[in-house]
Amino acid sequence: MAPPPNTYSESWWGGKEERGTPVVVKMDNPYSLVEIDGPGMAAPSEKARGKNAKQLTWVLLLRAHRAVGCVAWLAAGFWAVLGAVNRRVRRSRDADAEPDAEASGRGRAMLRFLRGFLLLSLAMLAFETVAHLKGWHFPRSAAGLPEKYLRRLPEHLQHLPEHLRRHLPEHLRMPEKEEIEGWLHRAYVAWLAFRIDYIAWAIQKLSGFCIALFMVQSVDRLVLCLGCFWIKLRGIKPVADTSISNDDIEATAGDGGGYFPMVLIQMPMCNEKEVYETSISHVCQIDWPRERMLVQVLDDSDDETCQMLIKAEVTKWSQRGVNIIYRHRLNRTGYKAGNLKSAMSCDYVRDYEFVAIFDADFQPNPDFLKLTVPHFKGNPELGLVQARWSFVNKDENLLTRLQNINLCFHFEVEQQVNGVYLSFFGFNGTAGVWRIKALEDSGGWMERTTVEDMDIAVRAHLNGWKFIFLNDVKVLCELPESYQAYRKQQHRWHSGPMQLFRLCLPAVFKSKISTWKKANLVMLFFLLRKLILPFYSFTLFCVILPLTMFVPEAELPIWVICYVPVIMSVLNILPAPKSFPFVIPYLLFENTMSVTKFNAMVSGLFQLGSSYEWVVTKKAGRTSSESDILALAEAADADARPPPAKLHRGVSEGGLKEWAKLHKEQEDATAAAAAAAAPGTPVKKSKAAKAPNRIFKKELALAFLLLTAATRSLLSAQGLHFYFLLFQGVTFLAVGLDLIGEQVS
């Protein structure tokens, strides 16, 4: 029998009920429908009306306050942008004092071309606007004329081929002689005839060629994505040999047995004061027998303060028992390749079997060598094991987010697919382990290009060495946070391959590798992905598309402008699914970067001076959250050892004294120079400041060109073309004003 209901608990709303006892509330009439103006509807009182009116007033006031706040926020943001633009325009001359390909004579040709193109487009826009206002685009009584008359072509256009006649606008009708009014109208008619006879077909032919290249490159990208999908589906990945032989036990008897070959770690750096300490700290904490590992810090810095700091950091870790040495070249030639070549010439290098390379901003995990070196065991043809990059500042700003999309696709798709199916890919220059014999058989590091990593990879591939890419082994590093640093990095990355292509092409045909590998190296690795991609991207979207707005007889299909690029951008963003909201900004930004990549490709192909320039990418010195864990492990390890010499901020006591002395000398020299220049003026201590934001003239010229073309598209009522040109022009404008990356106030 059920217990009687607890009326007390029901009336008290569960306040005094027993813990865990549910409260059941029964409603006699759960669905009570009251008819409006019916007998059950009570008349609203004046008090309720006043209350509702007050509530409505407060809601409206709250929404009005939010609207005003939104408008004020937009106005403040717009004013801040205008202020930043004004400051950058005023500082542009000072910023241009830094060496740059754009400011030199060899870089002015493209800027002059873009300026001339812009001036011509503005003149054509003014001309077309006058013609549109006067109705010269249409017959005077177009509404009352039959359709067949509107489609009629003049006699001198009957000879046009069918594919050009098909692209002629339906409203085009050349006026008769008696309809021409004045010299301006006559000039416009002559311009119409000239662009149809001589310009339209040339633009149409060039656009067809670029569309064909675009489709070939799209198919290549689709095949790479399918290959990556198949690798994920089947779980294909390199497997290391973890077995332990008797030779391994004898060679590492003091380390408990295992496969621990002699490994040399090289850390090339140059004036990278922001990141040297973190990088050296991570490398020195790699889990490997210390007597079987040597760390070379290859310092090419010309800043004496930076040299002293790096030397002091090396001294600190040497006192802690790490086998580490500091090297500084007196003859600093050949950039990074010359630095590595000089380090490999040391006599003690012959005692080592493998060499791992880390740039100054890389932070390897302690198990890096244990995850990479075992792949060499039992695989004598393996020359390189490459790890994937991971980025500590990928969410810092919009620029780093877009870079993360690009590089995630590069590692997840390009490197992994080429490594699995071809056993060849371009060495990324860092976070990789080389077999020293492979380097020596391939001629070692060469200084002939600025992409020494790709150079050694191609030569090793021609000698028959195989590569492995480990997608699950990641090494933290930094992305450039400013557009200026990213632009210089991309210029070097795209000019060097074209320079290398010219140099190694004879060696490719003379090599003994298979014909298929030769074709892949020439057609896909160099031509399609290094030359064709920047060529068609710049030509199609930055030159031909604006031209078709002023020459409407030649047009680009909508699927070329919109649909296929969006699909390709979605494929690019799949390895980084969290970045999917940035698919449209990524597409627009990649088109913007085509200017820099095209310019770099041309300079490398024709061996212009800018292809030999090497600029060290600026670093911010950011670290990961894993640094805290490593610091705790370091502290625990330090407790088990006798206390070393007193350290301060990661430098030894002797190194700190030397640095302090040098720093004081520099301060005294600065104070003396300031006093001599302006006697009686107090001297302010200056901090190391970042380079200010600047304006980029090529991007600005293209921004105004695309916006002019967008305005012209309104006269032809081309809606989708207008929106694409508008957004692309605004993107060029934001990049040209350096509003996309790090903002230095």
From Swiss-Prot:
It is a multi-pass membrane protein. The keyword tRNA-binding does not apply. Keywords: Cell wall biogenesis/degradation, Glycosyltransferase, Golgi apparatus, Membrane, Transferase, Transmembrane, Transmembrane helix. The chain crosses the membrane at residues 116-136, 196-216, 531-551, 556-576, 695-715, 720-740. GO terms for molecular function: glycosyltransferase activity. Probable beta-1,4-glucan synthase rather involved in the synthesis of the xyloglucan backbone than cellulose. Seems to work simultaneously with xyloglucan 6-xylosyltransferase. Xyloglucan is a noncellulosic polysaccharides of plant cell wall and consists of a glucan backbone substituted by xylose, galactose and fucose. This is Probable xyloglucan glycosyltransferase 3. It comes from Oryza sativa subsp. japonica.
